[in-house]
């Protein structure tokens, strides 16, 4: 089983990214579970979505703290609150304009800086696509399932008028993740 965690603040689309990933895994014949945690604030409150993906049945619907393989963070307060769930040596991708890991964190985890929000805003031209940029990043780092099936599930989840922008966002997420890994 692969355990992923996306964290940010309300309004950044982290829950949507989790829904797309878990739905894509189910459509692919596997098991996908999404468990979200967020405050009552509509925008701005800490948000977390844990995604469990497996080819075998998942018997417990929550991520195991300290065993998460991959985390993506777009807000400092959420990063600080939820980072300890990532296993030693696990991968954490941060939005460097908003999240600043301390030196100790860089020793515990493999941390990559990818400007997800800037990519969505400046290269896609629509900041709302940041969750899809994040989706592409997560897929490139984890390879948890067929990337084309995730792309298709994502395109099925967005309105027609924004399909092209979201497809570009997904591709840019993959591209930047490849570059970050070297």
What feature does the model see in each segment?
Residues 1-182:
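Active-site cofactor/cluster-binding pocket
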């Amino acid at each position: 089983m692969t355990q992923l965690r996306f964290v940010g603040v309300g309004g950044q689309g982290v829950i949507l990214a989790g829904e797309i990933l878990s739905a894509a895994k189910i459509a692919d014949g596997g098991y996908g579970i999404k468990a979200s945690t967020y405050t009552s604030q509509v925008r701005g409150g800490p948000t977390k979505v844990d995604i469990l993906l497996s080819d075998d049945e998942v018997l417990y619907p929550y991520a195991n703290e300290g065993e998460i393989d991959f985390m993506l963070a777009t807000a400092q307060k959420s990063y600080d609150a939820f980072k300890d769930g990532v296993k030693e040596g696990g991968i954490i991708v941060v939005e460097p304009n908003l999240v600043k890991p301390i030196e100790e964190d860089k020793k515990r985890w493999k941390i990559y800086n990818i400007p997800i929000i800037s990519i969505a805003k400046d290269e896609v031209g629509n900041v709302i696509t940041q969750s899809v940029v994040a989706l592409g990043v997560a897929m490139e780092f984890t390879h948890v399932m067929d990337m084309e099936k995730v792309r298709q599930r994502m395109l099925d989840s967005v309105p027609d008028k924004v399909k092209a922008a979201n497809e570009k966002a997904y591709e840019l997420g993959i591209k930047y993740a490849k570059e970050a890994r070297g």
